[in-house]
Amino acid sequence: MPTEEEVRKAEAEYGADAIQELKFPENVRERFGMYIGSKDARGLHHLVYEIVDNAVDEALAGFCTHIEVTIHKDGSITVADNGRGIPTGINHQSGKTAVELVFTVLHAGGKFGNGGYKYSGGLHGVGASVVNALSESLDVTIKREGKVFHQTYSRGFATSDLTKTGTCPIEETGTTITFLPDSQIFETTEFNYGTLKTRLRETAFLTKGLKITLTDERTEPETQKVFHAEGGIREFVTYLNRGNEVLYPEVLYCEGEKDGVLVEVALQHNDSYNENCLGFVNNVITPEGGTHIEGFRRAITKIFNQYARDNKILKDNDEALAGEDIREGMTAIISIKVEEPQFEGQTKQKLGNSEARNAVESVVTEKLTYFLEQNPTVAKIICDKSILSQRARAAARKARDLTRRKTALDSTSLPGKLADCTDKDPKNCEIFLVEGDSAGGSAKSARSRATQAILPLRGKILNVEKAREDRIYDNKEIKAMITAFGTGIHDDFDITKLRYDKIIIMTDADVDGAHIDTLMLTFIYRFMPELIKTGHVYLAMPPLYKVEKNKKVWYAYDDEEQQRILNEIGLDNTVKIQRYKGLGEMDPDQLWETTMDPERRILKRVMIDDEDKSEVDLTFSILMGDKVEPRREFIEENAKFVQNLDI
């Protein structure tokens, strides 16, 4: 207990002057998590999205047709648009130019008050000022009313006055912003071309007719990609379905307005068993859904049940189709525009507007009902697939119940092949999923028995991308993983029952090992995605090379490290180099030292950003689906990112 003197001192110190107000830019620089989420690569790229979103607002308002994003060799990035250009006059309320207001005041911009943007993704109006606050340098050039203006900023402050630097044709307008992220703030300041490509492609699909050019000047020759979708979200659905066979050629499309909400929906079924329905509000993805998704699902369930009853596809006594049955294999984009979107939190994860639910349900019900009446063949295909899904779901439920009864998840009913750890606190425990018997044997001998469990996977793992849930219970390896993890799957999933803090996939460093990695990741992503979202899934990184000289041993995890070691020790006839093809080539001591020892090993955590859901779904369907051509294109496009190729 504090003494009376200590209490009096604390009370005296905690006066009005103890309350500190952080002003711009300190409030952003010290509390950046409130504005961009994190200081890692995700937060870094968020800066680009903020500026691009401002340009997209111009496009949504009908004033911008082209956005150019350029990554420069010095690490800076430029976003240029041909919109109206930021106003350059004096704002009478503040006495500052409108440009300086936009870049140095939070919640300033054309999305507030009248005469600005009707629909805007940047709800909070903090984009440009936050980018300024978190940039080592920022330059803005504006073309407006036949004049060219320029101003510079650094870490939130203007470093020059807004100056007229020249003239331009009166019809030539726009804003060009170049900024260099602040290395004092960010863990990395290197922009990822692939990350930006995914986001900008998505933006182009959502903004019909908008052209977006992405250029990377860091490569030789420079890399450039142009995104332009006259078909809008219809083309988006076609793009997302390219890894699967579609069940009918048309992309079903609905468009309308109700209660001030603009609704646009496109959907198409494919031959997979996965639902991929993505929601967007004013071009901002809502990973956790919200009222617009609720309205869509309600409409879809009602429409198809009504159609199936009216056309005797479902008999009077048949069970109604569940929404998940109708959405099996469905790819859908639900894109709405709302004047005042109500998001849950700054990161806009979930929409809360009740009018959005009613608007989407109303528009989809009206338009889709008419389409089905005019296209009975398509309607029958969807209903038939839904009925098959319903039957499979019932079979899966029975198999799941049977599995539960046979293996109540306790220590006495764990898989026989599992070498479990003795510590029962999940926070301390990890499980290695090991390919093959020989490697499994070495791993069991190498492990720390207290905290490391080993599950050898002997048979072939089912490719769940091509199988409904009822079939996975027939696969021994997948059943063993489900039982060992303890969480259950799909609707039964419960993260609190997870038996291990780390699930580590440990396979050979060759093509077969990579294939098994992908099979296991596909299973976890499709049936237990929360394990990935919460950071519990890892890939072990066994060494590729063993380098030996004069009885000293070095391990190299890639070609670059091997070369570095050889440069240090000198390459002569006393050097022995072994290329590991499999985990079984290492004895238990080597396996522990290189791959399993928490003090020395390298693990790669598998993470998925909610904003990348569409691209992740597409990647799994391309890699694990039946269509060869999209897989070939994917490999060709991504081959340059591969560090080690085993042929």
Per-region residue spans from a language model:
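Alpha-helix capping/hinge segments and adjacent helical runs
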Residues: F24-P25
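Short conserved segment of the HATPase_c
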Residues: R29, I86-G109
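C-terminal interaction appendages of subunits in large macromolecular complexes
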Residues: R391-D410, D425-E430, G441, S445-R447, ...
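GHKL-family ATPase ATP-binding module
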Residues: M1-A18, Y49, D57-A59, C64-S76, ...
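Conserved, non-catalytic sequence blocks in retroelement Pol enzymes and Pol-derived host proteins
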Residues: G89-S94, H292, G323, D470
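Conserved short strand/loop->alpha-helix "switch" segment adjacent to the catalytic nucleotide/phosphoryl-transfer site
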Residues: E30-Y49
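Residues immediately C-terminal
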Residues: D57-E58, G85-I86, V511-D512
